Amino acid sequence: MSLIKIDQKAYEYNLRHIAKKIGSFQRLICVFKDNAYGHGAKLLAPLAKNLGVSFVAVKSEEEAQEIEEFFENILILSHRPHGNENSRFIYALNDISQVKKYKQDIKIHLKIDTGMHRNGICVENLEHAIDLIRSSDLKLTGMFTHFASADEMDGSFFVQKENFQKAKKIVKKYFSNLLFHSHNSAALFRGKIPEDEYCRVGLVQFGYGDSNLKRVLSLYAHRLSQRILQKGQSIGYGGIFTAAKDMEVATYDLGYADGLFRYNGKGELVLGNGKVMLGKMSMDSFSCENSGEEICVFKDADIWADFFHTINYEILVKLNPNIQRVLV
């Protein structure tokens, strides 16, 4: 049975490193959306709580309910208002037209569009948005934005930072004691975080984005069968790989149905133990040189991301939630 191992010490090390950069665990918002980027939100929640994290962000109400026992504050980022919101949670207000659709007395964080143009209210429309919120029964407790290019060396990051500062000045005229957060994983190590802000950390908490961090997740598969592949014999669909000599091969219990990108047999896809995948990946299995009962498929998503010309996020979040995840 395939298995995901979560390195508890590595995760705790990363959070301590991040908290030191920010100033405290109290200013840290751990983003646990999409099953904590494939790592297992319910598995990691008690670890974060025990270190002092009290604020997390998720995608939906369903995700919030899975971990609500662990955290005092849970922000739901991608909610479509339905009028029956849970007062236990905080909801992102992504569009000003949604103000009247929320249940009364619900806590909200106002999303500001500072230049990404995906969700949120433009700074130019902020005064109008504030008027609508003040005339409603919603409880504005925070305001935030998202940087589109914090990991790229262009000027848009600084433009967005300036726009958010403008938005903060405006909203502070009408509300006090708001919680602000703008810096995401990519922005965390790119400069000083304003003293009046929290920091949302996503993939960086799992060891990506800074060389001082440690990878948390490693993916393993277990052997289904083994055989001697004789010289000239092929393996898998289409016979893409043909043995140049007699070799001992094995089939392992992980395939593209488990959320992996489908390897088509072209190029060398290096596994976590240094072996290469042989032939096309099947729905529920793959083959390689016999590596024992258990094989590490990957422990660094960057390697697979480079091979498949994508980003490490996509490699990790696609991992099937039904794969067992254990702390090691």
UniProtKB/Swiss-Prot annotation:
SUPFAM superfamilies: Alanine racemase C-terminal domain-like, PLP-binding barrel
In-chain residues carrying the UniProt-annotated modification N6-(pyridoxal phosphate)lysine: 33
Biochemical pathway: Amino-acid biosynthesis; D-alanine biosynthesis; D-alanine from L-alanine: step 1/1
Provenance organism: Campylobacter jejuni subsp. jejuni serotype O:6 (strain 81116 / NCTC 11828)
Function text: Catalyzes the interconversion of L-alanine and D-alanine. May also act on other amino acids.
This protein's UniProt keywords: Isomerase, Pyridoxal phosphate
Protein name (record): Alanine racemase
Active site per UniProt: 33, 237
GO molecular-function terms, A-Z: alanine racemase activity; pyridoxal phosphate binding
EC number: 5.1.1.1
PROSITE patterns for the chain: ALANINE_RACEMASE
Enzymatic class: isomerase
Organismal lineage: Bacteria, Pseudomonadati, Campylobacterota, Epsilonproteobacteria, Campylobacterales
Cofactor(s) listed: pyridoxal 5'-phosphate
Annotated family: Belongs to the alanine racemase family.
Residues binding substrate, per UniProt: 118, 283
One annotated Gene Ontology cellular component of this protein: cytosol
Catalytic activity: L-alanine = D-alanine
InterPro entries: Ala_racemase, Ala_racemase/Decarboxylase_C, Ala_racemase_C, Ala_racemase_N, Ala_racemase_pyridoxalP-BS, PLP-binding_barrel
Gene3D superfamilies tied to this protein: Alanine racemase (3.20.20.10), Lyase, Ornithine Decarboxylase, Chain A, domain 1 (2.40.37.10)
Gene Ontology BP terms: D-alanine biosynthetic process; peptidoglycan biosynthetic process
